[in-house]
UniProtKB/Swiss-Prot annotation:
Name of this chain's protein: Histidine--tRNA ligase
Molecular-function annotations in GO: ATP binding; catalytic activity, acting on a protein; histidine-tRNA ligase activity; transferase activity
Entry annotated with the keyword Zinc: no
Taxonomic superkingdom: Bacteria
UniProt-listed GO biological process terms: histidyl-tRNA aminoacylation
Keyword presence, Flavoprotein: no
Organism, scientific name: Streptococcus pneumoniae serotype 19F (strain G54)
Enzyme class, first EC level, given as a word: ligase
Length: 429
């Protein structure tokens, strides 16, 4: 058997992982500005954590979950999304306690797992960055979180992003709308796709979100959730819209947007951009005020979003956005002869301990091959160290871009390379 990675997974090699590290680091910096702190949860959870919160009738639970019984006969699932595990952690660790500052703001990043057809930007193991805010029902929390997502997408370079906005109202409004939707769709049941015929019985709102052509035709004249909002739900949505307008954030009301998870209420949103004629969702989320109580905690408001890293990187690539990744070496030491081997090891270590990104040759190659490696590494400065340099204690340091050279002692390099680095036109941080 030829050993290969499983279908729907990928190896993220060094050239690509640099982009991943940049995106993750960039997200951390943005989230810190909004006072979010990182939380890390297990990649597997008890099956009920996901099935009960995400919804027993959702595609995630019925079709896409990786679940199994472990050796202790416990029903386990690999996490398919990030919110339910974070809510479980919030409740289990009693972060709702009075002494914990509210609202509680968390972000997470890591792998998720769904058994679905692999395609560009959507794999069976995919990576998600997300945030969750607990303890505030203020519409300003909805807006601040949406604006944070917009801030991240704009600063990282995503172009042509449009904010799609909707509300699912409170449970009473949602129940009234659900019944109206059933009444509307039932006479059209035979025209719906097989999946939507099933959804009509279990979760009719999901029919609105279907990508099947026959379903899109069926819901063209469906009733709007906006006509079923009670006073509380209408006031919340109006406040969100007004605050977005106050901040100069454009949005599109999309009454057919429902999101794929059952726990949402009130505000839901997606950031969508067009790639090669197709609309791609790059970030999505909303409010989920009942989820903490569902996990056994007190009634606690919640709001959050998630975005897929693979899809984000795909969009950046398609839009021609080059991430500002610094891969250059500060110093490369070309080593000539066995007599310079030990000194080269001492020197490269001294440079690293001073904070420089440094490398040396280990393969006893000809100088031409070593200089080629220095160019491949986009090296800023080049040192050639042979037995004669070791004996004299003097060496030439070359700017590998301008070819300017300075003669210095090995002792100076070991103790204060910053001075030489700057003399050759480079600056230390």
């Amino acid at each position: 058997m030829k050993l290969q990675k499983p279908k729907g997974t990928q190896d993220i090699l060094p050239a690509e992982s640099a982009k991943w590290q940049y995106v993750e680091g960039f997200a951390r910096e943005i989230f810190k500005r909004y006072n979010y702190a990182e939380v890390r949860t297990p990649i597997f959870e008890h099956y009920e954590v996901i099935s009960r919160s995400v919804g027993d009738t959702t595609d995630i639970v019925t079709k896409e979950m990786y679940d199994f019984y472990d050796k202790g006969d416990r029903h386990i699932t690999l996490r398919p999304e990030g919110t339910a595990p974070v809510v479980r952690s919030y409740v289990e660790n009693k972060l709702f306690a009075p002494e914990v500052q509210k609202p509680s703001k968390f972000y997470y990043m890591g792998p998720m797992f769904r058994y679905e057809r692999p395609q560009a930007g959507r794999l069976r193991q995919f990576h998600q960055i997300g945030v969750e805010c607990f303890g505030s029902s203020n519409p300003a929390t909805d807006v601040x979180t949406i604006v944070m997502a917009a801030h991240f997408l704009k600063e990282i370079g995503i172009q042509g992003v449009k904010l799609h906005l909707n509300t699912l109202g409170n449970p009473e409004s949602r129940a009234a709308y659900r019944q109206a939707l059933i009444d509307y769709l039932t006479p059209l049941k035979e025209t719906l796709s097989k999946d939507s015929q099933r959804r009509l019985e279990e979760n009719p709102l999901r029919v609105l979100d279907s990508k099947e052509k026959e379903d899109k035709v069926a819901v063209e004249n469906a009733p709007s959730i906006l006509d079923f909002l009670d006073e509380e739900s209408q006031a919340h949505f109006d406040a969100v819209r007004q605050m977005l307008e106050n901040l100069g954030v454009d949005y599109i009301i999309d009454t057919n947007m429902v999101r794929g998870l059952d726990y949402y209420n009130h505000t839901i949103f997606e950031f969508i951009t067009e790639i090669e004629g197709n609309d791609l969702t790059v970030c999505a989320g909303g409010r989920y005020d009942g989820l903490v109580a569902y996990f056994g905690g007190p009634e606690t408001a919640g709001f959050g979003f998630g975005l897929g890293v693979e899809r984000l990187l795909l969009i950046l690539e398609k839009q021609g956005v080059a991430l500002p990744i610094e891969n250059a070496l500060d110093v490369y030491i070309a080593v000539l002869g066995d007599g310079a081997n030990v000194k080269a090891l001492e020197l490269v270590q001294a440079l690293r301990q001073q904070g420089f990104k440094a490398e040396r040759d280990y393969l006893n190659r000809k100088l031409k091959a070593q200089f080629k490696s220095a160019d491949v590494f986009a090296t800023k400065t080049l040192i050639t160290l042979g037995e004669s340099e070791v004996e004299s204690g003097q060496v030439t340091v070359k700017n590998n871009q301008t070819r300017e050279e300075v003669q210095v002692s090995l002792e100076t390099i070991s103790q204060n390379f910053s001075e030489i680095f700057e003399k050759l036109g480079f600056y230390t941080q």
